Amino acid sequence: MIEEEVLKIIKPTEEDKKGIEKVLEIIRERLNKLDFEVEGSFRKGTWLRQDTDIDVFVFYPKDVGKEYLERNALNDIINRIKDLDYTLAYAEHPYVIVNINNVEVDIVPALRVESGDKAITAVDRTPFHTKYVTSHLDERGKDEVRLLKRFMKGIGVYGAELKVQGFSGYATELLIIYYGNFRKVLEEASKWKHPIKIELTKPMKIFSEPLIIPDPVDPKRNVTAAVSLKNIATFSIAAKYYLKNPSIEFFFPSKKVEEKVKGDVLILRLNLDEKSSEDIVWGQIKRSVNKIERALKQYGFRVIDVQAWGDTNNITIAVQLESKNIGQYYLNIGPQYYSQTIEDFIQKNDNIWVGEDGRLYSIKERKEYDAETIAKKNIVLKVKYNIESYWLQNTEDQQIMKFLRKTPTWLK
């Protein structure tokens, strides 16, 4: 079976585990005497081979408050690991990423709380997530989670960060706990129609998102609140097609695709001068994408697609139009002859005439008819950046090729 082949590739070996334990030993020595725990997929046994980020949580008494985590706790952690290769990262509050032997370790300060529903910061729930998952999954269940994670990665819907708006690792674990195995998740997902409710516990509030999985450790929270409708639909379609025709392509899609340029494609390459939180940057990028699309449509361009990809430093925005050429003048449709607004229309316009349908018309000059200028004006990044822009002629860039192709390789 395809799943068994995939498991051989993605399931960590004993050698892999020993390598991670060596990395953890270095971290344990540095955090000696602190209240810390290993969390995340490694602790839960659902991690993927060659795709290991270790989460280490350092806990402080809840009465010290969130500000203490951002200053004192963070400084304490940095002082203990400052001779290692580390960088600062930002989520709800700052944390440290340490790189040891090409393994990333996230060291996250958190508050020690009595239960998941008493969480003060988002990460305070994590140990309760770990306990819930480890108490509900056996070894086979952990492999089923691995398959679901790799499937979601392959089709591009894995990751709860704003850039992806997909499924978190915890969400995949809950799906396996609820449905039982990988195949059963796909069978049910192939029939989804939103709103979808998956209740391992009764919700403590009304949720409005398209996919609702109340958190078993904090029923006031929807685990899948961040999952976009686009990713829910993509997962449902992929599930349907995999069940009809299983293929390793769903798990490991072809890296090379080819497609010719259709319409006119504007490429905007953004290089950010400042480091910032990934979610903050991608929140602004997503607003920029929406704003660019709306503005171009308002000015009369026929927009095929606008997408963005990249990291927190280098971002590409691709704009595909039916044509970049648009007239300097356009037909302005006015009111019917009996409307009370005709005087206002006549006063504000030139080149006015009455059409065969009894409606007033005029010719108006567009305020802007250069698509490149419009796109650049509607980028709303709040950090300093440099921009390079060009109209695509041909390319070997695989991300651009995927943008041009649209259809994922697992679908066709």
UniProtKB/Swiss-Prot annotation:
Its EC number is 2.7.7.72. SUPFAM superfamilies: Nucleotidyltransferase, PAP/Archaeal CCA-adding enzyme, C-terminal domain, PAP/OAS1 substrate-binding domain. ATP binds at residues 41, 44, 129, 149, 158. GO terms for molecular function: ATP binding; CCA tRNA nucleotidyltransferase activity; magnesium ion binding; tRNA binding. The keyword tRNA processing applies. The keyword Nucleotide-binding applies. CTP binds at residues 41, 44, 129, 149, 158. InterPro entries: CAA_C, CCA-adding_arc, CCA_tRNA_nucleotrans_2, NT_2-5OAS_ClassI-CCAase, NT_sf, NuclTrfase_I-like_C, Polymerase_NTP_transf_dom, tRNA_NucTransf2. Mg(2+) binds at residues 53, 55, 106. GO terms for biological process: RNA repair; tRNA 3'-terminal CCA addition. Keywords: ATP-binding, Magnesium, Metal-binding, Nucleotide-binding, Nucleotidyltransferase, RNA repair, RNA-binding, Transferase, tRNA processing. Its cofactor is Mg(2+). It is an enzyme of class 2 (transferase). Transmembrane segments: none annotated. It comes from the Archaea. It catalyses: a tRNA precursor + 2 CTP + ATP = a tRNA with a 3' CCA end + 3 diphosphate; a tRNA with a 3' CCA end + 2 CTP + ATP = a tRNA with a 3' CCACCA end + 3 diphosphate. Catalyzes the addition and repair of the essential 3'-terminal CCA sequence in tRNAs without using a nucleic acid template. Adds these three nucleotides in the order of C, C, and A to the tRNA nucleotide-73, using CTP and ATP as substrates and producing inorganic pyrophosphate. tRNA 3'-terminal CCA addition is required both for tRNA processing and repair. Also involved in tRNA surveillance by mediating tandem CCA addition to generate a CCACCA at the 3' terminus of unstable tRNAs. While stable tRNAs receive only 3'-terminal CCA, unstable tRNAs are marked with CCACCA and rapidly degraded. Belongs to the tRNA nucleotidyltransferase/poly(A) polymerase family. Archaeal CCA-adding enzyme subfamily. Homodimer. HAMAP family: CCA_arch (MF_01264). A single active site specifically recognizes both ATP and CTP and is responsible for their addition. This is CCA-adding enzyme. It comes from Saccharolobus islandicus (strain M.16.4 / Kamchatka #3). The lineage of its organism: Archaea, Thermoproteota, Thermoprotei, Sulfolobales, Sulfolobaceae.
